[in-house]
Amino acid sequence: MLEGGEATGKSTQAARLAARLRDRGIEAVETFEPGGTSLGAQLRALLLHGDAPVDPTAEALMIAADRAQHVAEVVRPSLARGAWVVSDRFVPSSLAYQGVGRGLGVAEVEQLNALATAGVEPDLVIVLDVSPAVASARVPGVRDRLEEEDDAFHLAVHEAYRDLAQARGWSLVDASSGVADVADAVWSVVSEVLAP
């Protein structure tokens, strides 16, 4: 599970990690949230590119609906056949974005997502850590609704990821360096799980 704020390199690192796993003969299913299913793509479009304002609770519910479909359609079947699932976002995103960033509360958002995930939890959470200022400079051109949020929101999300990582034993990887260096740092964390 790769996590982090906007423009921390999650998609890039998920692709690199999945490729490294495949190179070692491990079936790796690369996926993402929101939008990793047909229903999810529709919810993602509404959530990130819709014109109507979205209430924070409605946002959390939309993401939980996407997650429930994602778990049922992609994650659970992949795990059932023994594949590794490399996901760009999962429940930790909701805890940071909706629980802290939107002020809904981590415990409340976690409870909502317990229903959506039906007991599926990641074996490993890697948070790609980049300051919001550096991350913002990485986002070219047109931004989606979350990328357009103010600096205070992005700082709250960034700090939430750091706090949650420390409290829950998630791995924090400095993602401010080059893509290859970050990929090596991510692989170093994953290698510990692979080691017998």
How should these model regions be labeled?
Residues 2:
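Hydrophobic anchor at the beta1->P-loop junction of P-loop NTPases
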Residues 7:
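Walker A (P-loop) phosphate-binding loop of P-loop NTPases
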Residues 10:
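Conserved lysine of the Walker
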Residues 13:
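Hydrophobic positions on the alpha1 helix immediately C-terminal to the Walker A/P-loop
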Residues 16-18, 133-196:
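NTP-dependent small-molecule kinase module
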Residues 24-117:
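ATP-dependent small-molecule kinase phosphotransfer cores
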Residues 31, 86, 124-126, 171-173:
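Hydrophobic/aromatic beta-strand patches that form the interior of the parallel beta-sheet core
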Residues 89, 94-159:
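A glycine- and Lys/Arg-enriched "phosphate-lid" helix/loop adjacent to the NTP-binding pocket
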